Amino acid sequence: MNADDQKKAAAVRALEFVKPGMKLGMGTGSTAEHFVRALGEKVKAGLDIVGVPTSERTAKLAASLGIPLTNLDDTPHLDITVDGADELDGKLRLIKGGGGALLREKIVATASDRMIVIADASKLVKTLGSFPLPVEVIPFGSAVTARKIAEVASAHGCTGKMSRRADEYGEPFFTDSENFIYDCAFGSIPDPDGLSAALNRIPGVVDNGLFIGIAAMAIVGTDKGTDIIEA
């Protein structure tokens, strides 16, 4: 199976953990969209669930498929969240945020009893960091914040190019919360736990794309089917 087939296989396997009456968090990105589309087919066939999307993009897709939607203000407790990952390691530590929705994804995931990660085999790595780490920052004073990010990263053994994300027109990319994202190409992150905590102590940093101690399970698509990794 190619990578997209592996994503689909993982998404379909995740449906096994969805039960009638559940309140679900729905992730953002190409892998999560496979799950949302598969979930839409189940809803069309009569499955009774309600979903909380992690982005405007996911909300539009889910609505187009007839999936009933709610929000965390009205539904503050969720049963599971199913989302993709840009990278994951054997301890179920993740890098997320390639789709620009890391803050909402983390809020929704931590409002859930369980987070289930779905991914193709290429996303499973020994050491996080090959995928650039997204860090969400407020626009005010962002250049100062970026310098602080570089200093903190260096103190945790991470160096590399940092760049403010741009949209397809070359203009600054804004998240759904109207913040910037700096993508940090560290190559390797030797201490994900320490780096994540240190980054979030920087004034101006809203959050970062390291998900530590959040995922309960990963379903990884492979050439032969799917593998499950549990925390």
From Swiss-Prot:
One of its GO terms (biological process) is pentose-phosphate shunt, non-oxidative branch. Pfam families: Rib_5-P_isom_A. Substrate binds at T28, G29, S30, T31, D83, G84, A85, D86, K96, G97, G98, G99, K123. It catalyses: aldehydo-D-ribose 5-phosphate = D-ribulose 5-phosphate. Keywords: Isomerase. Its EC number is 5.3.1.6. HAMAP family: Rib_5P_isom_A. Homodimer. Belongs to the ribose 5-phosphate isomerase family. This is Ribose-5-phosphate isomerase A. It comes from Parvibaculum lavamentivorans (strain DS-1 / DSM 13023 / NCIMB 13966).
